Amino acid sequence: MESGTEEYELNGDLRPGSPGSPDALPPRWGLRNRPINVNHYANKKSAAESMLDIALLMANASQLKAVVEQGNDFAFFVPLVVLISISLVLQIGVGVLLIFLVKYDLNNPAKHAKLDFLNNLATGLVFIIVVVNIFITAFGVQKPVMDVAPRQ
């Protein structure tokens, strides 16, 4: 076995700059040398927002069902039905708005003002939805507890 100027390790050659050597550059995920596609990023962002919107829509539908099951005897029946209905309508509106945002080309400078307005509108509506849902939670939506033990 010859011992030259090369450095050998159990797993092979560790020349400077070779993969695995201490001075090698860390591997990059994907191709970061190309410019970011703004449309692709916006579409992913809108898809994620839409999924969260659907989850909240399902939660509000479940809350509405629980309130209706409690009936008119519940102290906060009317306010909760109104707040949940407002939240549901706003969520559907934001969902439609997100669909329109995905359809527009972000690389077209002529549409930037309109897209900026629609994006700000969606953000404002999401803020209102959050505030409405805070009030829904504050009024408390829970199913009535049935007494298991007989009363005497």
Curated annotation (Swiss-Prot):
Chain positions covered by the region annotation Helix alpha1: 44-55
Site-annotated residues for Cleavage: L56, L57
Acidic residues bias (residue ranges): 1-10
Inactivation phenotype: No visible phenotype in most cases. Some mice have dome-shaped heads and die within 2 months after birth. Mice show abnormal behavior, reminiscent of obsessive-compulsive disorder: mice exhibit compulsive grooming-induced hair loss and self-made lesions as well as increased anxiety-like behaviors. Mice are prone to systemic chronic inflammation in the skin, liver, kidney and pancreas. During inflammation, reduced motility of bone marrow-derived macrophages and protrusive membrane dynamics are observed.
Transmembrane segments: 79-103, 114-138
Extracellular-side segments: 1-78, 139-152
Record's GO cellular component terms: extracellular region; filopodium membrane; plasma membrane; synaptic membrane
Entry-annotated residues carrying N-acetylmethionine: M1
Consequence of substituting N60 to A/Q: Impaired N-glycosylation and reduced homooligomerization
Annotated spans, Required to induce plasma membrane rupture: 40-69
Region (N-terminal adhesion motif) location: 26-37
Residues the record marks as carrying a glycan: N60
Positions of region (Disordered): 1-29
Stretch list, region Helix alpha2: 58-74
Molecular-function GO terms, alphabetical: cell adhesion mediator activity; cell-cell adhesion mediator activity; lipopolysaccharide binding; membrane destabilizing activity
UniProt induction comment: By nerve injury. Expression is activated by p53/TP53.
Keywords carried by this UniProt record: Acetylation, Angiogenesis, Behavior, Cell adhesion, Cell membrane, Cytolysis, Glycoprotein, Inflammatory response, Membrane, Phosphoprotein, Secreted, Synapse, Transmembrane, Transmembrane helix
Cross-referenced InterPro entries: Ninjurin
Protein family per UniProt: Belongs to the ninjurin family.
Protein name in UniProt: Ninjurin-1
Species in which this protein is naturally found: Mus musculus
Source organism phylogeny: Eukaryota, Metazoa, Chordata, Craniata, Vertebrata
